[in-house]
Structures are given as C-alpha cells and as structure tokens.
Design a protein with these regions (language model features):
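NTP-dependent small-molecule kinase module
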Residues: 48-128
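Short, active-site-adjacent cap segments at secondary-structure transitions
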Residues: 2-5, 101-103
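A glycine- and Lys/Arg-enriched "phosphate-lid" helix/loop adjacent to the NTP-binding pocket
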Residues: 3-81
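Tryptophan-centric aromatic hotspots in well-structured domains and transmembrane helices
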Residues: 1-2, 92
Length: 128
C-alpha cells in the first residue's frame, strides 16, 4: 500500500493512477498471491507538518540524511494527495494526526487506530 501511494504520486493523470493501481493490485494479490489487507489506515499528516517535523528531527541528529522522498517536497505533496485519493478509492481509514497545525499525541492517535480496528472487529462479530 505504501508502494502504491508513492508510485501513484509520480503519476499526474488520474485515469493513469487508476490504471496503475489496478495493475499493482492484480500483480500483488492475484499473480503473486500476497495477502490482501483487511484494513488500511492512512495516518494523515499534511506535508507542511511532516516536513517541519523532519527538519526538527534532522536538527537533533547531526548526521541525519533524508531519504530520496524526503528530499523532494513536490513528491511528498503528490504522494500525500495520492494517499487521500486512495482513502476514497479503496475505503482506507483516514486518521488525522494533526490538530491546529500540531501533531496530536501518540496516545490520541493510537486510541483512534484502536477504536477503528475495534469497530471493524465488532462489526465482523455481529455479522457472523
């Protein structure tokens, strides 16, 4: 799923994004028989916040080197937008990790993740 998000972020034409995603799903789940996830959770951190956090993290570590995607803000923005699109296209759960421009606490985010998964488990149990 992260590969789908980053690779789709390189494609500008939405119909081509859909075509790529269909191809990748076929490859991973039908051809390679990889297990299909029951749930995907997109931890939504806007690009400006993630870049600020990466910059702060780099300031704390003298020899921190950004990965190839962190070095390219335009790619980060396109990948982020792809993530939001994938939430709509595939029904991924989107959890906002930022409130008023600041990262929410780990505990708050974890509670949202837990409650989302718990709700899915309860729905499954009630339907079986």
């Amino acid at each position: 799923t992260s590969n789908m998000l980053h690779q789709a972020g390189k494609i500008r034409d939405l119909s081509q994004v859909d075509k790529y995603c269909d191809w990748l799903e076929n490859l991973e789940y039908d051809t390679l028989k990889l297990p299909r996830p029951n749930k995907v959770i997109f931890l939504d951190v806007p690009v400006e916040v993630s870049m600020r956090l990466a910059h702060e993290r780099a300031g704390l570590k003298a020899n921190t080197q950004k990965d190839i995607h962190e070095q390219n803000p335009e790619h980060l923005l396109h990948a982020y937008n792809s993530g939001k699109y994938m939430c709509q296209k595939y029904g991924w759960t989107r959890i906002s990790c930022v409130e008023n421009g600041n990262l929410r606490s780990i505990e708050d985010i974890a509670n949202d993740v837990y409650n989302s998964v718990k709700q899915d488990i309860n729905n499954y149990e009630n339907n079986n």
